[in-house]
């Protein structure tokens, strides 16, 4: 029931990664990267399908060898989500996966080779209508820039990016997006700010090597949140030393928190105190797990007492306010029923699923009516 975020998106060109639009006001795409051995086709396909189930728009796959390129061919045949091939050092691998239907090529200008090799990759991408991501990383800047700046700086990352943007411009190729990633939040944020002023290509956001599940999520939320709140960013990846599925979940949580893109349930829950009338923490944890399959955007407030419960319920799709033995259930801000505290989880799950089905049906009818006009 909350309004959309009052954020003015940066204007950018439109490209497509497979069937996913990027830039020019398109929904911000959430992506992750496999961490399996790409040559283990079964494991990689299984992980990609798990990422698809939690809403991944795009998945990146590392292709370090020609054997991995051959495996990529088999992987591509078994999944539906667009795949980005991550290429380092050997430009010939990019040419090979292009033959196998890759949806996007990610190259690192710091290690892909000389201009002639880049030209060869670009010509191939143009012929096959494959977009490119220029991926600049603070950890792999070109040697001359390392010597010039002494250490990674926003200006160094910008210069690296612009060097290769200019190269693609000279080759008359505009189907690309750019990233300037760093593990330091301030370095990454300032680099993206500078880059956003220089080009109108889509920007892929990320805090690289952010850390483990908890610390990495925090760093990514701060860094990406700052940029997104300024309207910067067209795709994102939350980089975690964790199950890639968590990257997608955190990515959507960041977008939901900024009211930029909604997917699934946005739970609003109190941290609890001695006033709670039912087990709020247990209820929220259980429902988050049980309702992962719900993709309908909904705000669900679960508050343990009457101090803040009614107020949160007023602006929630569904809201629970703790009471003695029974708790008040609100729907669209109106009190509808009372739920037994001892059976809260099962009752609330049923109500949420019913509401999601109702909202889905209403949206389906709206779409049909629009199409009929």
Swiss-Prot record:
<keyword id="KW-0479">Metal-binding</keyword>
<dbReference type="GO" id="GO:0005506">
    <property type="term" value="F:iron ion binding"/>
</dbReference>
<keyword id="KW-0408">Iron</keyword>
<dbReference type="GO" id="GO:0051539">
    <property type="term" value="F:4 iron, 4 sulfur cluster binding"/>
</dbReference>
<feature type="binding site">
    <location>
        <position position="312"/>
    </location>
    <ligand>
        <name>[4Fe-4S] cluster</name>
    </ligand>
</feature>
<dbReference type="InterPro" id="IPR016425">
    <property type="entry name" value="IspG_bac"/>
</dbReference>
<keyword id="KW-0560">Oxidoreductase</keyword>
<dbReference type="GO" id="GO:0016114">
    <property type="term" value="P:terpenoid biosynthetic process"/>
</dbReference>
<comment type="function">
    <text>Converts 2C-methyl-D-erythritol 2,4-cyclodiphosphate (ME-2,4cPP) into 1-hydroxy-2-methyl-2-(E)-butenyl 4-diphosphate.</text>
</comment>
<feature type="binding site">
    <location>
        <position position="305"/>
    </location>
    <ligand>
        <name>[4Fe-4S] cluster</name>
    </ligand>
</feature>
<keyword id="KW-0411">Iron-sulfur</keyword>
<dbReference type="GO" id="GO:0019288">
    <property type="term" value="P:isopentenyl diphosphate biosynthetic process, methylerythritol 4-phosphate pathway"/>
</dbReference>
<dbReference type="Pfam" id="PF04551">
    <property type="entry name" value="GcpE"/>
</dbReference>
<comment type="pathway">
    <text>Isoprenoid biosynthesis; isopentenyl diphosphate biosynthesis via DXP pathway; isopentenyl diphosphate from 1-deoxy-D-xylulose 5-phosphate: step 5/6.</text>
</comment>
<protein>
    <recommendedName>
        <fullName>4-hydroxy-3-methylbut-2-en-1-yl diphosphate synthase (flavodoxin)</fullName>
        <ecNumber>1.17.7.3</ecNumber>
    </recommendedName>
</protein>
<dbReference type="GO" id="GO:0141197">
    <property type="term" value="F:4-hydroxy-3-methylbut-2-enyl-diphosphate synthase activity (flavodoxin)"/>
</dbReference>
<keyword id="KW-0004">4Fe-4S</keyword>
<dbReference type="GO" id="GO:0046429">
    <property type="term" value="F:4-hydroxy-3-methylbut-2-en-1-yl diphosphate synthase activity (ferredoxin)"/>
</dbReference>
<dbReference type="InterPro" id="IPR004588">
    <property type="entry name" value="IspG_bac-typ"/>
</dbReference>
<comment type="similarity">
    <text>Belongs to the IspG family.</text>
</comment>
<dbReference type="InterPro" id="IPR045854">
    <property type="entry name" value="NO2/SO3_Rdtase_4Fe4S_sf"/>
</dbReference>
<keyword id="KW-0414">Isoprene biosynthesis</keyword>
<dbReference type="InterPro" id="IPR011005">
    <property type="entry name" value="Dihydropteroate_synth-like_sf"/>
</dbReference>
<feature type="binding site">
    <location>
        <position position="273"/>
    </location>
    <ligand>
        <name>[4Fe-4S] cluster</name>
    </ligand>
</feature>
<feature type="binding site">
    <location>
        <position position="270"/>
    </location>
    <ligand>
        <name>[4Fe-4S] cluster</name>
    </ligand>
</feature>
């Amino acid at each position: 029931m909350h309004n959309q975020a009052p954020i003015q998106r940066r204007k950018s060109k439109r490209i497509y990664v497979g069937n996913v639009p990027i830039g020019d006001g398109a929904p911000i795409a959430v992506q992750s990267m496999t961490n399996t051995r790409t040559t283990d086709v079964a494991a990689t396909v299984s992980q990609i399908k798990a990422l698809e189930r939690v809403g991944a728009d795009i998945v990146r796959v590392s292709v370090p060898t020609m054997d991995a390129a051959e495996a990529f061919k088999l992987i591509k045949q078994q999944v539906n989500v667009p795949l980005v091939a991550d290429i380092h050092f050997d430009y010939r691998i990019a040419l090979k996966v292009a033959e196998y239907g890759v949806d996007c090529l990610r190259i690192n200008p710091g290690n892909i080779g000389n201009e002639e090799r880049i030209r060869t990759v670009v010509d191939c991408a143009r012929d096959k209508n494959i977009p490119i991501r220029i991926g600049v990383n603070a950890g792999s800047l070109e040697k001359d820039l390392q010597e010039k700046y002494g250490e990674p700086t926003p200006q160094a990352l910008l210069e690296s990016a612009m060097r290769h943007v200019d190269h693609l411009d000279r080759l008359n190729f505009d189907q690309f997006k750019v990233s300037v990633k760093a593990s330091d939040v301030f370095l990454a944020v300032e680099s993206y700010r500078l880059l956003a002023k220089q080009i109108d290509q889509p920007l892929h956001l990320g805090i690289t090597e952010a850390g483990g599940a908890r610390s990495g999520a925090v760093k990514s939320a701060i860094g990406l949140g700052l940029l997104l709140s300024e309207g910067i960013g067209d795709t994102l990846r939350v980089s975690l030393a964790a199950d890639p599925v968590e990257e997608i979940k955190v990515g959507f949580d960041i977008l939901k928190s900024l009211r930029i893109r909604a997917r699934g349930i946005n739970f609003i829950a109190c941290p609890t105190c001695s006033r709670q009338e039912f087990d709020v923490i247990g209820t929220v944890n259980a429902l988050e797990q049980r309702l992962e399959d719900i993709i309908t955007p909904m705000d669900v407030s679960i508050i343990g007492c009457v101090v803040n419960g009614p107020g949160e319920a007023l602006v929630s799709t569904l809201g629970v306010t703790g009471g003695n033995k029974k708790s008040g259930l609100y729907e669209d801000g109106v009190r509808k029923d009372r739920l037994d505290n001892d059976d809260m989880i099962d009752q609330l799950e049923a109500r949420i699923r019913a509401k999601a089905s109702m909202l889905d049906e209403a949206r389906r009818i709206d779409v049909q009516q629009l199409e009929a006009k």
